[in-house]
Amino acid sequence: MKNFSLWCDFIENSFLDNEFLNLLSHEINGATSNPAIFKNAILNSPIYKDKILKLKGKKTKDIYEELAISDIQKAADKLAPLFYQKNDGFISIEIDPRLHDNTTLSLGEAKRLYSAIGKENVMIKIPATKASYEVMYELMKNGISVNATLIFSLEQSQKCFEALNAGLVEFRKNNIALKEQNTRTPQAVISIFVSRFDRLLNPKTKEQNRIGILNANLAYNNIYSKNEPNIRALFASTGVKGDNLPKDYYIKELLFENSVNTAPLDAIEAFKGKMDFKKPLMNFEIYTALNQIISQSEREKACNDLLSDGIEQFCIAFEDILKAL
């Protein structure tokens, strides 16, 4: 499979005991969550109602964390065989998105969540903001796996890699007797968001549904060229809205070696068994194609707007959960 890994971009308590097990038997190798996913699960699934009632009286964020941590622990246990046998099998949980501009609070929350979950195969999701690169470095340095998220620009992907790799180097330096200590080297993914580009820019361009693919290919090339197997490109935001594209479009178009794709359930269902690997375009081919579709200044503005919007959406989802609890 050329070191390609397909993850499930969904989590919900009863799902983990049923459909998720079926997905694991069909080569799903990991899972991701975010505030919007937890909002949908906690506010719409009846399985959480009794749990919430038992936790009444606690602070709303504490209630949320107990629910989320329980689900993450369950997912981590289901994925544990993949983690120990194939060095995959990760589940991601995001820190409070409202901390995105505070390095100290983000780092403290990330370490606290990782400790509370108590599972090696958990990745802590950190948004790729200016305040967060130091957080990524410190987590990797301390042996905590990281999912760097909300990446839209090549600059973001480069800064994420630099921070993650620097932490990885420090971890290895500090753990020379790695095998004797039975300590696993942390892993990281750099989550490049894809379809959001196209949904934003399709109305402005003649060539539809290509900018997200080309932009993701560019970031992938940058990460892959570093030749660090413990830091992989992950393609996120790979769901299709509407009926104008196949549901698995953003999986098939980015089927690159040594990469991860986290996809919604309908995309996974449509994709089953179609391992037709793509050869990534070279950078000069990507820039030629991009420049024919849209200007560099418009792409840069889109990157900035999408990052701001992504953070805002996750903050709103997080606040909605807390208000409902």
Curated annotation (Swiss-Prot):
UniProt catalytic activity: D-sedoheptulose 7-phosphate + D-glyceraldehyde 3-phosphate = D-erythrose 4-phosphate + beta-D-fructose 6-phosphate
Function according to Swiss-Prot or TrEMBL: Transaldolase is important for the balance of metabolites in the pentose-phosphate pathway.
Molecular-function GO term, any one: transaldolase activity
Gene Ontology CC terms, in alphabetical order: cytoplasm
SUPFAM superfamilies according to UniProt: Aldolase
EC number: 2.2.1.2
One example of a Gene Ontology biological process annotation: carbohydrate metabolic process
A Pfam family reported for this protein in Swiss-Prot or TrEMBL: TAL_FSA
Active site: 125 (schiff-base intermediate with substrate)
Cellular compartments annotated: Cytoplasm
Pathway it works in: Carbohydrate degradation; pentose phosphate pathway; D-glyceraldehyde 3-phosphate and beta-D-fructose 6-phosphate from D-ribose 5-phosphate and D-xylulose 5-phosphate (non-oxidative stage): step 2/3
Domain of life: Bacteria
PROSITE patterns: TRANSALDOLASE_1
NCBIfam families noted in UniProt: PRK03903.1, tal_mycobact
Descriptive protein name: Transaldolase
Keyword annotations of the record: Cytoplasm, Pentose shunt, Schiff base, Transferase
Origin species: Campylobacter jejuni subsp. doylei (strain ATCC BAA-1458 / RM4099 / 269.97)
Family according to the record: Belongs to the transaldolase family. Type 2 subfamily.
InterPro entries: Aldolase_TIM, TAL/FSA, Transaldolase_2, Transaldolase_AS
